[in-house]
Amino acid sequence: MRTLWIMAVLLVGVEGNLLQFNKMIKIMTKKNGFPFYTSYGCYCGWGGRGKPKDATDRCCFVHDCCYEKLTDCSPKSDIYSYSWKTGVIICGEGTECEKQICECDRAAAVCFGQNLRTYKKKYMFYPDFLCTDPTEKC
């Protein structure tokens, strides 16, 4: 019973925006964000440092930079509206923050889709301690 309670708390703790971002990734790549993009390279997932390992990791670096510019927003928790039709994601109405967060997520999902051919399994679950190059600036 305790395990079920812990799982429920963890599910509630998953930010709405991250679930939306996962759906966008699925639309553009046909892959789930979890696990394919949650700990890929040096920038996909929480935090980031060093130099992006490849084009997919660069998508995550740019996404992190996009979020960084949203100083008065909560990009990991604000819920936004969007729709899609034949592989095109369209950000909907909402607050300025919601629209900007949606655009950051949309751009990253599109970037992932454009770089599917160069995705390397060796960078899945890449250990942070191997990200030793100087960190790039946004």
UniProtKB/Swiss-Prot annotation:
Protein localization: Secreted
PROSITE patterns: PA2_ASP, PA2_HIS
Family from the record: Belongs to the phospholipase A2 family. Group II subfamily. D49 sub-subfamily.
Main location: secreted
EC identifiers of the protein: 3.1.1.4
Single annotated GO MF: toxin activity
PANTHER family attached to this UniProt entry: PHOSPHOLIPASE A2 FAMILY MEMBER, PHOSPHOLIPASE A2, MEMBRANE ASSOCIATED
Role noted for this protein: Snake venom phospholipase A2 (PLA2) that displays edema-inducing activities, as well as presynaptic neurotoxicity and myotoxicity. PLA2 catalyzes the calcium-dependent hydrolysis of the 2-acyl groups in 3-sn-phosphoglycerides.
InterPro entries to which the protein is assigned, alphabetical: PLipase_A2, PLipase_A2_Asp_AS, PLipase_A2_dom, PLipase_A2_dom_sf, PLipase_A2_His_AS
Gene Ontology annotations for the cellular component aspect, listed alphabetically: extracellular region
Class in the EC hierarchy, top level: hydrolase
Tissue distribution: Expressed by the venom gland.
Protein name (Swiss-Prot/TrEMBL): Basic phospholipase A2 PLA-N
Catalytic activity: a 1,2-diacyl-sn-glycero-3-phosphocholine + H2O = a 1-acyl-sn-glycero-3-phosphocholine + a fatty acid + H(+)
Disulfide bridge positions per record: C42-C131, C44-C60, C59-C111, C65-C138, C66-C104, C73-C97, C91-C102
Pfam families cross-referenced by the UniProt entry: Phospholip_A2_1
Residues binding Ca(2+): Y43, G45, G47, D64
